[in-house]
Regions:
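Outer membrane beta-barrel transmembrane domains
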Residues: 265-294, 301-305, 315-410
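Outer-membrane beta-barrel "beta-signal"
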Residues: 341, 414-426
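Signature for the C-terminal beta-barrel architecture of outer-membrane proteins
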Residues: 160-161, 181-303, 317-321
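N-terminal periplasmic/intermembrane-space "pro-region" immediately following the signal or transit peptide
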Residues: 1-85
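Outer membrane beta-barrel
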Residues: 85-231, 253-257, 338-366
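Residues that define the transmembrane beta-barrel architecture of outer-membrane proteins
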Residues: 88-94, 146-150, 204-208, 244-248, ...
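Transmembrane beta-strands of outer-membrane beta-barrel proteins
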Residues: 67-71, 113-115, 167-169, 223-227, ...
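Repeated loop/turn-to-beta-strand initiation elements of outer-membrane beta-barrel proteins
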Residues: 106-110, 161-164, 218-224, 258-264, ...
C-alpha cells in the first residue's frame, strides 16, 4: 500500500526536483524493502507477455479425436436365381473402419477414414450366387483385408448457418444431401443396401465432390452437392468438370413440425454409358435396359420421417429417375420406393430397435427404344431386423430380407438373405 501510494504521488509530480528530502528518503527505503519483489514481478510480467503473444499467434489448439467401428457378420442366402448353388453357403465377413477427426481453426473439421473388409466376389449378388444387386448387404465391401483410405473430408463453417464440404475421397450425394433415413448406418441400420437409403443419393458411383449446407431458418435447410467419378485423372472423359459420370443434386429439407422431417430433391446427372450405377435394383434398371450410350439423367426424390409417438417412427421415400439418350431417341423411366416402421426400446430395453421395411427396388417402368425393354414384373423387398444393444459400444443385429420376383421377373423364385451382424464401436 505504501509503495502504491508513493508511486501515485510520484506520478502526480512533474519533476523529481520537486521532491522533498523526506520523500527522497521514503523512496530509498521502499526501494530497499521491495527491490526483490519488484524484480520478481518484472520477470513474471515478461513471462505473461510471452504467453499472450503465443496465444495470439495460435488462437486454437487442434485436438485429434480417433474412433472406430468393426462389423463382424455371419450371413447366408437361400433359393432365388442361383446358377451354381454357391449362394447357400454361409459366409463370415467383416468391415472395419478407423477414423480421425481434427479441427484447425475451431470452425472446421478435417476427417480421415481408413477401411478394410473381406466380402469377396460381390457376395450373394455375384453371378455364381443370386446374380442380382437386390441381394447386396449394407455393410458389404471388399478390400481383400488391405487397409485403404475410404474417406477424406474437410468441412468449414463460413457462418453459424452456412457450411461447405469438400470430399476428394469417398464421396456420394448423401455426403452433403441429408438422406433422411433412420436406417442409413452400415453398423446399426438396415441390413440390405437397398433399404438403407434412397437410390437417388447413390446415383453415378461417384468418388469425389463437394457441396454446401445452408440453414436458412430453424425449420428450413437448403443443400447442394456436385460429384464426379475419376476426379483425380486428367484424361479425356475424366477429371473434375469433364467426367463421363457426374451428378448434381439440390435438396430443400424441412421440419414442418417437431416430429416431422421431410426433404424434396432434384437431381441432374450425366452418364457416358447410360448407366445409373446405384446397385439397388434390377440390372435393367441400373443399366437403363443396357442403353449403352451417353445419357442425361434427371430425377426427383422425396423423403419423410415422422415420429408418430415417442418410440414409433414411420419413414418413407420415393424416387423417379428420367434418362434420355443424347445421341438417339432412347429414354427410360425408373422408380423405387420404401416404407419403414420402427419401434425403439421394445420390451423396456433401452437402445434396442426393431424395424420392418417394405419397398420396391429400382425398376424400369417405361421407356422408348430400349434394347431389352422394361421390367415386366415387380419385385417386393421385405426386411425385418432387431438391433440388440449389449452396451454403449456393442450391438448384435439378427435380420432377414426376402425379395419376391428377383430382378422384377416372376420366373425367378424368391431370394432370402439372413445375417447376424455384430457391431463394435470405440
Amino acid at each position: 500500500a505504501a509503495l502504491d501510494g508513493c508511486l501515485q504521488a510520484w506520478g502526480e509530480r512533474r519533476s523529481l526536483a520537486d521532491l522533498s528530502p523526506e520523500e527522497w528518503q521514503t523512496l530509498e527505503r521502499l526501494q530497499r524493502d521491495f527491490g526483490g519483489e519488484l524484480e520478481d514481478l518484472g520477470d513474471r510480467v515478461v513471462g505473461l507477455e510471452r504467453q499472450i503473444a503465443q496465444l495470439e499467434a495460435q488462437e486454437f489448439s487442434p485436438t485429434l479425436v480417433m474412433g472406430g467401428e468393426s462389423i463382424i457378420a455371419l450371413s447366408a442366402g437361400f433359393a432365388g436365381n442361383d446358377n451354381s448353388g454357391d449362394a447357400t453357403n454361409p459366409v463370415f465377413t467383416h468391415l472395419s473402419r478407423l477414423g480421425f477427426v481434427s479441427s484447425l481453426t475451431g470452425r472446421d473439421r478435417l476427417r480421415l477414414e481408413f477401411q478394410a473388409s473381406n466380402f469377396a466376389n460381390r457376395g450373394f449378388a455375384s453371378p455364381s450366387g443370386f446374380n442380382s444387386d437386390m441381394a447386396l448387404l449394407s455393410f458389404q465391401g471388399n478390400t481383400d483385408n488391405q487397409i485403404q483410405l475410404s474417406r477424406l473430408e474437410y468441412r468449414v463453417a463460413l457462418s453459424d448457418r452456412f457450411v461447405i464440404t469438400a470430399r476428394p475421397v469417398g464421396f456420394s450425394l448423401s455426403s452433403v444431401l441429408t438422406a433422411n433415413s433412420p436406417y442409413f448406418d452400415a453398423g446399426r441400420g438396415a441390413i440390405s443396401r437397398f433399404a438403407e437409403a434412397s437410390p437417388a443419393f447413390k446415383l453415378g458411383r461417384l468418388d469425389a465432390g463437394g457441396g454446401f449446407d445452408w440453414l436458412i431458418s430453424d425449420t428450413v435447410r437448403l443443400q447442394g452437392a456436385y460429384g464426379v467419378r475419376n476426379a483425380n485423372r486428367s484424361q479425356e472423359g475424366q477429371g473434375l468438370f469433364n467426367s463421363d459420370h457426374s451428378a448434381f443434386g439440390v435438396q430443400l429439407f424441412l421440419k414442418p413440425a417437431p416430429t416431422v422431417l421431410t426433404g424434396i430433391s432434384y437431381l441432374n446427372a450425366y452418364s457416358g454409358n447410360g448407366r445409373l450405377d446405384t446397385f439397388t435394383g434390377s440390372f435393367l434398371a441400373d443399366t437403363n435396359s443396357f442403353m449403352n450410350e451417353p445419357a442425361r439423367i434427371q430425377g426427383v426424390n422425396a423423403t419423410l420421417q415422422w415420429r408418430v409417438v415417442d418410440n414409433v417412427t414411420f419413414s418413407t421415400w420415393g424416387t423417379w429417375l428420367f434418362s434420355d439418350a443424347i445421341d438417339s431417341d432412347r429414354s427410360a423411366t425408373t422408380t423405387s420406393y420404401l416404407f419403414g416402421l420402427s419401434y425403439a426400446d421394445p420390451f423396456q430395453r433401452e437402445g434396442d430397435l426393431v424395424a420392418l421395411l417394405v419397398g420396391q427396388p429400382l425398376r424400369v417402368v417405361s421407356g422408348t427404344g430400349l434394347p431389352f425393354g422394361e421390367d415386366e414384373d415387380t419385385s417386393l423387398h421385405i426386411e425385418l431386423f432387431y438391433r440388440l444393444r449389449l452396451s454403449d459400444r456393442i450391438s448384435i443385429t439378427p435380420g432377414v430380407f426376402v425379395v419376391t420376383n428377383p430382378e422384377h421377373n416372376a420366373d425367378n423364385p424368391a431370394l432370402v438373405v439372413g445375417t447376424i451382424r455384430t457391431t463394435f464401436r470405440f
